[in-house]
């Protein structure tokens, strides 16, 4: 329970005042532009609907839980239905992608008229058996900078590596070692709090599943932050097809120069 309350307070889920404090008082990163406020509100609301736990597995069962039990299509409303409690067990990219979809649904519902089309939602919803590098979910689930490449391709946000620019609510791909690709040790998360020498993030974590975790930054070799700034661009999801480079990360390792090029980041 304490884990859940820490997460809620850090992301400002209790009230707008807490939100403003947490998003601007970390001492690291810039204030939230007014145009992005509605996205952060949707993200906080979406995150509040996840229960802690459920177990962590990178298994067929976890993939089926995401694609067949948690993500449904309502033929009557012609809109998606996300049953978050059905998405167990889970793994890091399934947790973050489901949070992205739920937040996008909340954001879209708050607009004067729907922005994300039926065709776009059908492209965004994961399919069981979808391969890495195929379609939006296949991109987001790929090794390396999968989600960063998806967001860059859609023009839905920005990617960067500088801790000083990061703020709560940014997606954060952690690399525990220098390896990127076939033998990488990575973890897709959402930044909750930058505590200086340590960092708190939300994801599906070993062994418990959904929840927040705090680790020393000294354990982290590198990070890629992804910030959603234009959620309306997810309406372009049907244009996301196959990405051979992302698919190849199951078989090869790559360097940061390639990662930055595909993610729209500049080399330092």
Where are these regions (language model features)?
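Glycine-rich, flexible loop segments associated with nucleotide phosphate handling
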Residues: 84-89, 184-189, 245-247
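Positively charged n-region of N-terminal signal peptides that target proteins for export
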Residues: 1-4
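N-terminal capping segments
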Residues: 22-142, 263-268
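Boundary at the C-terminal end of the N-terminal hydrophobic targeting segment
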Residues: 18-20
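Short regulatory "switch" loops immediately downstream of catalytic or recognition motifs
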Residues: 101-109, 175-177, 230-233
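Low-complexity, Gly/Ser/Thr/Pro-rich intrinsically disordered linker/tail segments
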Residues: 199-268
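Bacterial N-terminal signal peptides
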Residues: 7-16
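...with weaker cross-activation on analogous glycine-rich loops/strands in unrelated enzymes
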Residues: 118-209
């Amino acid at each position: 329970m304490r884990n859940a309350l820490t997460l809620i307070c850090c992301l400002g889920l209790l009230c707008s005042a807490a939100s403003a404090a947490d998003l601007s008082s970390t001492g690291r990163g810039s204030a939230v532009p007014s145009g992005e406020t509605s996205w952060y509100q949707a993200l906080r609301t979406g995150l509040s609907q996840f229960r802690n736990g459920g177990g962590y597995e990178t298994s067929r069962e976890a993939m089926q839980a995401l694609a067949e039990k948690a993500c449904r299509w309502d033929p009557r409303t012609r809109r998606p239905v996300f049953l978050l409690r059905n998405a167990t067990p889970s793994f890091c990219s399934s947790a973050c992608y489901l949070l992205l979809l739920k937040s996008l649904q909340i954001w879209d519902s708050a607009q004067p008229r729907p922005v994300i089309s039926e065709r776009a939602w059908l492209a965004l919803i994961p399919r069981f058996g979808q391969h890495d590098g195929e379609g939006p979910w296949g991109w987001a689930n790929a090794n390396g900078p999968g989600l960063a490449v998806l967001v860059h391709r859609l023009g839905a946000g920005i990617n960067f590596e500088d801790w000083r620019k990061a703020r709560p609510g940014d997606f954060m791909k952690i690399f525990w070692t220098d390896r990127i690709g076939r033998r990488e040790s990575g973890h897709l998360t959402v930044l909750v709090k930058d505590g200086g020498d340590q960092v708190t993030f939300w994801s599906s974590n070993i062994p418990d599943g959904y929840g927040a975790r705090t680790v020393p930054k000294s354990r982290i070799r590198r990070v890629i932050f992804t910030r959603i700034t234009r959620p309306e661009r997810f309406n372009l999801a049907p244009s996301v097809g196959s990405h051979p480079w992302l698919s190849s990360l199951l078989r090869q390792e790559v360097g940061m120069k390639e990662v930055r090029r595909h993610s729209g980041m500049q080399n330092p």
